Regions:
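Conserved SAM-binding loop of SAM-dependent methyltransferases across substrates and taxa
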Residues: 201-213
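A short SAM/SAH-binding and catalytic strip from SAM-dependent methyltransferases
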Residues: 262-277
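C-terminal alpha-helical "lid/dimerization" subdomain adjacent to the S-adenosyl-L-methionine
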Residues: 298-344, 348-351
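A short acidic, Gly/Pro-enriched loop at the edge of an enzyme's catalytic core
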Residues: 251, 255-264
């Protein structure tokens, strides 16, 4: 094997100092940030900060004290002090200029990590990565056995967090879809209907229900815990008259209802379904039955390139998605997904992409 000198490596524009910074310094900051966010969500810290400011118009900074959090959330002061100290070092919070005992959120942290109603919120996405840790032992065993991991058998709070990872992508997709199909969306909001397949805990339904206030929505799923959470969400928002949540498979629903929908949504669901091509082909036959003749099937999926394909921009989350669900999911890339659609009754498929936001619109 050819011996590669340090100078030759440096000649490629990367020094050993660069790599130390990347792996040891930046890596540790990133790792600690994920730990802080995950623990902050589990301990209720971010929820408390959200509730504290949600009634304030245009709030973008939250101020608080260590003692306040300890008292309100019944947390040990020593552990909380250590968490806050690391959060200060990682840039989540800052010390207030006027009072050194008061902390405040760093710029844009409120929008990114606390206010889950904000379009830029990524707390759910980053918080979900925290849950890779408890799944590591299962993943390590599966490296040897090749067994699939049943995500629904993980603790319900972990499953909920993993599904919330899709909340941000769902919001971005809705925003881009509404911008790209203005005429269709105007009619959808007047008297239209939406079916979400694999509605889970209702995060995506919440996004569309708030934007399309006159649209009827049906959500279906086979996970009983997700169904209960989605129904609770509907009740809390007084949406019972126009939104129904049903515990049914797509095949069962397609063959027991006469209703047709203007928009059918599959948001980060297809990859988790049975990987067998015949099963998925039947799924799309059922979706074809449920869609109006002029309707749109919207599929939001991570498009994962081949491992040895040339590197593409905006693929970190897609490839991380593949890694976190390896063995229990089957993904497509743009070429293989288009080939799959060509094998179904649908005749038109368009890939919509803007930056890192992407989805497919499929028609009869």
């Amino acid at each position: 094997m050819e011996k590669i000198s340090r100078n030759k490596q440096d000649g490629a524009g990367i020094s050993i100092k660069d790599q130390i910074k990347k792996f040891a310094i930046n890596g540790l900051y990133g790792f600690n940030t994920i730990i802080l966010i995950g623990m902050g969500r589990k301990l209720g810290i971010f929820d408390y900060l959200y509730e504290k400011t949600k009634s304030i118009s245009n709030a973008n900074i939250v101020k608080f004290t260590l003692d306040e959090l300890a008292k309100k959330l019944n947390l040990d002061v020593n552990y909380l002090d250590a968490w806050l100290h690391l959060a200060l070092e990682c840039g989540l919070f800052e010390i207030d200029d006027l009072n050194r005992k008061i902390l405040k959120t760093a710029p844009f942290v409120y929008e990114l990590l606390i206010n889950y109603d904000h379009n830029s919120y990524i707390g759910g996405t980053l918080g979900a990565f925290y849950n890779i840790a408890p799944a590591q032992e299962i993943m390590l065993k599966n490296f040897k056995t090749g067994k699939a991991m049943d995500l629904l058998k993980l603790p319900s709070d972990v499953v909920k967090d993993l599904q919330e990872r899709s909340r941000r992508f769902g919001k971005l997709i809705e925003k881009l879809f509404t911008k790209s199909f203005t005429s269709f969306c105007k009619n959808l909001n007047k008297k239209g209907s939406i079916l979400e397949v694999g509605c889970g805990y209702g995060f995506n339904i919440e996004t569309w229900a708030k934007k399309y206030e006159k649209t009827r929505i049906i959500g279906i799923d086979i996970d009983p815990k997700g169904i209960l959470a989605a129904k609770k969400l509907v009740e809390e928002n007084n949406w019972n008259e126009r939104i129904k949540i049903l515990k049914k498979s797509t095949h069962e629903y397609a063959h027991t209802t006469k209703e047709k929908f203007d928009l059918i949504i599959l948001n980060q669901v297809l990859h988790e379904m049975n990987p067998d091509e015949n099963y998925r082909n039947q799924l799309f036959k059922d979706l074809y039955l449920l869609l109006n003749d002029k309707g749109i099937l919207l599929v939001g999926e991570s498009m994962v390139p081949d491992t040895f394909a040339p590197r593409e921009p905006f693929k970190l989350f897609d490839i991380t998605h593949k890694f976190s669900e390896a063995g229990s999911a089957r993904f497509y890339n743009e070429k293989t997904f288009k080939a799959f659609i060509d094998s179904t009754p649908f005749t038109k498929a368009e890939f919509i992409k803007e930056g890192g936001t992407k989805f497919w619109t499929i028609r009869k």
